[in-house]
Amino acid sequence: MKKVRITAIRKTCYPDLMEKYENPIQHACEVEEGQVWVANGWCKPEGFCDSAWDSISPFVMTLAHGGGDFYDGWMKNPKSAMISCNDGFRPVSFYLEALDEDAE
C-alpha cells in the first residue's frame, strides 16, 4: 500500500447561496488553498476535514492500493484524481496523487 498526497487546489465560496439557504455555523471550512496532507495508505490524515474525507476517501483508498486511471483516462496522470468535497456552499477541490513511498 502507498501513501497518497492530498493538496487543496481551489476553494470556492457562494455567499448568495449561504445567505439564502444556510443557517450560520461557527466553524466553517478552514482549509486553505495550497494546504497539503499525506494519507498513510487508507488512514485519514490528522486534522483533515471529516466531511471532505467522506468525499475523497474512496479515491484515496484506490490510489493507495495501486489503482487509478479513473473513468477511463480522465486524468493526465493515471495515478491521480481531482475530487471536490461535498460542501455546496464552500467546496474545495483536492488533487490526490499516489506517492512511490510505502505506507507504514
Regions found by a protein language model. Name each.
Residues 1-3, 30-33, 101-103:
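A short, structured loop/turn motif at beta-sheet edges
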Residues 2, 8-22:
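Short, structured beta-strand/loop micro-motifs enriched in basic residues and often containing a Trp
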Residues 3, 36-38, 91-93:
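Intrinsic-disorder/low-complexity, polar/charged segments enriched in Ser/Thr/Lys/Arg/Asp/Glu/Gln
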Residues 13-19, 46, 102-104:
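Short, surface-exposed beta-strand/loop "edge" segments at domain boundaries and coil↔beta transitions
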Residues 17, 51-52, 59:
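Catalytic cores and adjacent flexible loops of soluble metabolic enzymes
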Residues 20-44:
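Short, flexible N-terminal segments of the mature chain
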Residues 44-55:
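Short, Lys/Arg- and Gly-enriched loop/turn segments at beta-strand edges
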Residues 58-104:
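Short, compact, well-ordered microdomains
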